[in-house]
Curated annotation (Swiss-Prot):
Cofactor(s) required for function per UniProt: Mg(2+)
Source organism of this protein record: Friend murine leukemia virus (isolate PVC-211) (FrMLV)
Coiled coil: 438-478
Region (Disordered): 111-218, 434-499, 513-552
Positions occupied by motif LYPX(n)L motif: 130-134
Protein name in the entry: Gag-Pol polyprotein
Family: Belongs to the retroviral Pol polyprotein family.
Binding-site positions, Mg(2+) 3: 1455, 1514
Residue span of region Interaction with host PIAS4: 345-393
Gene3D superfamilies: 1.10.340.70, 2.30.30.850, 3.10.20.370, 3.30.70.270, Acid Proteases, Gamma-retroviral matrix domain, HIV Type 1 Reverse Transcriptase, subunit A, domain 1, Human Immunodeficiency Virus Type 1 Capsid Protein
Binding site for Mg(2+) 2: 1183, 1221, 1242, 1312
Amino acid sequence: MGQTATTPLSLTLDHWKDVERTAHNQSVEVRKRRWVTFCSAEWPTFNVGWPRDGTFNPDIITQVKIKVFSPGPHGHPDQVPYIVTWEALAVDPPPWVKPFVHPKPPLLLPPSAPSLPPEPPLSTPPQSSLYPALTSPLNTKPRPQVLPDSGGPLIDLLTEDPPPYRDPGPPSPDGKGDSGEVAPTEGAPDSSPMVSRLRGRREPPVADSTTSQAFPLRLGGNGQFQYWPFSSSDLYNWKNNNPSFSEDPGKLTALIESVLLTHQPTWDDCQQLLGTLLTGEEKQRVLLEARKAVRGEDGRPTQLPNDINDAFPLERPDWDYNTQRGRNHLVHYRQLLLAGLQNAGRSPTNLAKVKGITQGPNESPSAFLERLKEAYRRYTPYDPEDPGQETNVSMSFIWQSAPDIGRKLERLEDLKNKTLGDLVREAEKIFNKRETPEEREERVRRETEEKEERRRAEDERREKERDRRRHREMSKLLATVVSGQRQDRQGGERRRPQLDHDQCAYCKEKGHWARDCPKKPRGPRGPRPQASLLTLDDQGGQGQEPPPEPRITLKVGGQPVTFLVDTGAQHSVLTQNPGPLSDKSAWVQGATGGKRYRWTTDRRVHLATGKVTHSFLHVPDCPYPLLGRDLLTKLKAQIHFEGSGAQVVGPMGQPLQVLTLNIEDEYRLHETSKGPDVPLGSTWLSDFPQAWAETGGMGLAVRQAPLIIPLRAASTPVSIKQYPMSREARLGIKPHIQRLLDQGILVPCQSPWNTPLLPVKKPGTNDYRPVQDLREVNKRVEDIHPTVPNPYNLLSGLPPSHQWYTVLDLKDAFFCLRLHPTSQSLFAFEWRDPEMGISGQLTWTRLPQGFKNSPTLFDEALHRDLADFRIQHPDLILLQYVDDLLLAATSELDCQQGTRALLQTLGDLGYRASAKKAQICQKQVKYLGYLLKEGQRWLTEARKETVMGQPTPKTPRQLREFLGTAGFCRLWIPGFAEMAAPLYPLTKTGTLFKWGPDQQKAYQEIKQALLTAPALGLPDLTKPFELFVDEKQGYAKGVLTQKLGPWRRPVAYLSKKLDPVAAGWPPCLRMVAAIAVLTKDAGKLTMGQPLVILAPHAVEALVKQPPDRWLSNARMTHYQALLLDTDRVQFGPIVTLNPATLLPLPEEGLQHDCLDILAEAHGTRPDLTDQPLPDADHTWYTDGSSFLQEGQRKAGAAVTTETEVIWAKALPAGTSAQRAELIALTQALKMAEGKKLNVYTDSRYAFATAHIHGEIYRRRGLLTSEGKEIKNKEEILALLKALFLPKRLSIIHCPGHQKGNRAEARGNRMADQAAREVATRETPETSTLLIENSAPYTREHFHYTVTDIKDLTKLGATYDNAQKCWVYQGKPVMPDQFTFELLDFLHQLTHLSFSKTKALLERSYSPYYMLNRDRTLKDITETCKACAQVNASKSAVKQGTRVRGHRPGTHWEIDFTEVKPGLYGYKYLLVFVDTFSGWVEAFPTKKETAKVVTKKLLEEIFPRFGMPQVLGTDNGPAFVSKVSQTVADLLGVDWKLHCAYRPQSSGQVERMNRTIKETLTKLTLATGSRDWVLLLPLALYRARNTPGPHGLTPYEILYGAPPPLVNFPDPDMAKVTHNPSLQAHLQALYLVQHEVWRPLAAAYQEQLDRPVVPHPFRVGDTVWVRRHQTKNLEPRWKGPYTVLLTTPTALKVDGIAAWIHAAHVKAADTKIEPPSESTWRVQRSQNPLKIRLTRGTS
């Protein structure tokens, strides 16, 4: 009845907007014409059943998709977007497609397979080894009606499926479910689980509905198995939430076993599961082990390929799962696969891995036993459940338990009869009875107090014993003295009273003698006492009485020794064993005779004048050490005898080191000095002597093999000579070289490699240390990946619970690793020491410092050596940063025990720690520049003082140093990036360093923030983190916190500047970028732990649905991957942050919808639309064309209607198509000012710029993501400005190059044709100078300013009302602005000079008269920057005044000139010219060096002419060297260096060089000799006797008379000649001096008194500087620069250190302004060589 049939193709064309929307959702684009072509003509040829009218059958669509996606030449890549869109319409149909979509039936197995009868219901499902039996539902549904009720419609296209109907299911016995309701009229078998879920949302749940499970293979309602594949989410979760097979095969095997039991996968599903969860190598290993497990008919593993392939096929089998046999095959396959997983998961036997399983500090014994059993299963072939292995498992359980549990288990009675369960129960008891941390801390405190009490009691006992012993010794001493005094008073030699003949000498009784005295003790006779009672045993110096006055205590070899000052002793004497003795000996003559004694080796002695090395006589028999005349001389001692005794003072009259102490305190002098951080009196040094560098010597890592350093491919040896080294530096590093040679770290060698050795002076001292320059070696050695920990996040592994620390710094760490002999030659260097007999090369046998791979190699070696320590002490935290170790424990006792174990381990391994830098068992330590205390890290005061002590930066380098030092502390400064924003631009190269108020404010704010820096908590990886983020003006700020009770403790303050692209976004999107940036930075500290993000914006919704207009696909993907990782990143509620602390405020802020705000901020003009306006005044079409024609790119732009051209213009050659499109669209908008306009463009670029990108560009400052300016910047700005000119505007995009008769197609073709025609239009040869009559250079667009009208009135022009313009000489007058734009454009094309451009303009015809043409053209040519940099310029500098001496010999000019060919090695001529007289001295030389200059100056000039006052030279190396300048300073000579590349500055000597060379050339031609050295005296004679500017020769000026030219052979003639006497000759010289020298000096001085200003440049002017050495296509001038200082002939400019002659600069702006009223003020600076100039108004 007139109705047309609806087909899928026609349906899609009628709803084409929805089709395009669907395509956009698939990220593709489709065209209607190609859509029809592919559907009706292309796809039917694929022979897959595609109808010409299209179809929504998913099977047919899939077949077409396979054809389209076929790889190689048979594929159709151009059809991919269209078939993808077809598929999307069929899979997710819109309402108008649903009636035509075929219902997707469940996947059934082949119908030929017999279906299984339904199994009877069972109360308990039968057991199976792999999966439970499948049962049919207990109650089946009734057979539904085929036709609906007669009262209803035949079919509801919106709710029902179209015919054909699905087959009905089996009838239910009663037709009702449990609820008694009639089953629904759904006749098909059970639908797919997904349909069931969707239906469940729309329909109420049925009480008796059977639960559907999404298993790959399940039994359907019709008795047939249905297939449902794995979902991608399941595979993703299994993959990411389980360890890899190589890491933990047991866990992954259990997972796969559970999947096989519950999901009943098919063969294909098993392959998909293995491919997802296993790597390729793991999968092959599992399949191989599974095939090995196939058994034959005899029940043993078979090797028959047929049986193996039947049971476990590698290719897809043809099993029918609807048959019992097919299911049995599948069951067998799963069993074999599970066996393969179990066999492949067994690792090779490794008992060390089992031994490495130890019980954790808080791990229960049961959990530890499970881990131990799992290790047995994984790393051994033994089954831990086997009773035969119970003994081994039990012993491992005991030995590897926690130390306290293991010790108690070992002491159990009847241990051998205990079972493993008994041991676990005992261990649980011990574990549960452990003391709590509080109890442990109390016990440790109590033990410490008891220990301290015992120590105090022992000290008191020792003190009492020492006092008692002292009183006893003093009593004996006093008794001896009194007895001696009594005997002296009695006189004589009587020793004792006379005895009777029968009197005992012992008891004084009579009747027996002394030998029979009963009172005399019996026993062996003791040694006879010494005669001197005042001399105590002084071996070792313990308890020795100090020598009598005068005495001095000096340090000898690091130990204090008290000497008796003995001026009679020629040599100083030591009495104690000083160590090794030398082979020298000396004969010592004393009062009782002579004896030979040996000398000691050199000992370092600390004197008042410094350290000296001295050799002593070792005389053990001497009562006291003697300070002889040898050391007294070095000490420069002075001895004064006064009433109180002799006084020994130093050279300055100050007392020397004199020490007076009691005898009982003398032992303190001999104690070994300890580092300041090691507790005084501790036993750490004595208990672990091998662990300290002070007691153990140089270390050697005994477990590390010698290192081999691999070279890069094709590397050759490099040999660099040793730099010159001063004597002081050589003597400073000599002891270090000697020490390393003695220790074997340096050895002599001969190597083709050689690098220089640099002596580096230690700051604040006069000591030197050797540093080798290994940069060239580093370039030739292979790079290795650096594995040194990052100090930024190293402390993240330190939990806050560990608050007792020990810090050790390994000394000479790199020297602990040996170098292989084949690699030792790489690090050779030169060293000469005649005293040691060394003259050649030395090299390192250990890993040297300065080698680029040394930190990484040592860090890895120490990590390997300390691995066992970490395993044995799991409750301790050991952090290592190269050679800095930090040990942390929870209690002081654990820290002490751990420190002892660590020191013992380091000593055994061969490493040495520095005792001076050790911090042992403290609650507050310094590590890596941080202060660790109470689980927090602080900035050290030294770090703060370093930043606070820096002065205000004056240069970019100083500012970079400040920012680098302060940037280390940025974690403590909230908003550091925003705070330092004004400072960073000044650090860029080429930027003028201008320190203003903003920079000073930022500088002070950073310092103030450091003073108030808070304490940051150490990251606790067991707790989640919270990140509070804020953003302000393109700067991201945040604080990372963790919960500490009810408070949030800051962990780090983060801040960063957003990139230019993100900084131009709206605030909500900037917050997304800020969160992404700070989340990445926070990940370095959180180490992958959960992170909760809190911000003032609803960021999660923006990330999930980002606006595509602002974000690129790459950036969107990056943000989503980073922020939508729900396992690691979560978003908290919206909070309002405090700008000072970045923490949330208690009150809630104003809420907003970010998506709404972004929707409002997407465009430039709010009413701009892309739909045609119904009441538009104009409908125009724009197009731009750019194409190549005859090798030249031509371009044009046009604005048209459907039938006529509105505007068309040819654009300059090389214009791109995008730029042409922008110009055309902009022109259309300008012409439609104040009107309603519909404008069509086929340019996506122009359309997107107007609608979307223009606003984005404006916000980001017209910069790209790299911070560079975007292309077509001027055109984009013009377009954005022109958007607001029309009253109403609609910019519509239309496809380009359309065919058809629609209005859009006709208009687009018209615009395209017009643009191409105007671009290809032929123009005359002078087209570049002709002006087109088209807009905008038409009379209608002329706008005359007030100034133009005044100039036209003066010119005599008239105003033409008809033409509405001014007319002069019969031509319309072009306004001044138009003239400037035209001439500037012409100059940019040609860059011709003023005169040539003017000549071309006068020769060519122009329809307009250009107002002020010559003046404008001159201004343009003179201000062109490119011309100023390239064009040559004549010097306008007038001749200056030369400074000359006031008498001969005071002012000389010196220069070297090269004379070729050089005979006998003489190639240079050193020329001296006296500026006063012009006298010349020239000396042939072989080298052009400073040594030659100083030699001739001191040996030739000074003896003959006296010491010069001024020397003038150029900037040659021989004159600017340190040697020449030092000699000049010592002699008091003012050495002036002339301007570079300005030979006129040394004009007098340069002219003399030319004169001498010309004369030598003439003499060589005349004589035929090439020996110019022989002819040089004749050339000098000519130069000295040539008249100068004043008519006098240099000889006459110097000597007052002409030289004698003729000798008269006739004696009579000689008598006639004038022969004045000596007196007369002297009078003549005096007259010459008055008549010649004074007038000459006055003439020179007059020139200086009235100097002519040779150049007009002033301080503050801007000038260009000549580039003397230009490269290819490089400008001739550089700059511009600002003038800082001036002299009459030279300038000093900002950015160039050397003075520049005025002839080498030109003004950047030739208009020299008149002098202003400003004045300059000179201020003194801290640097005596610098001044500060400031300008102020007068």
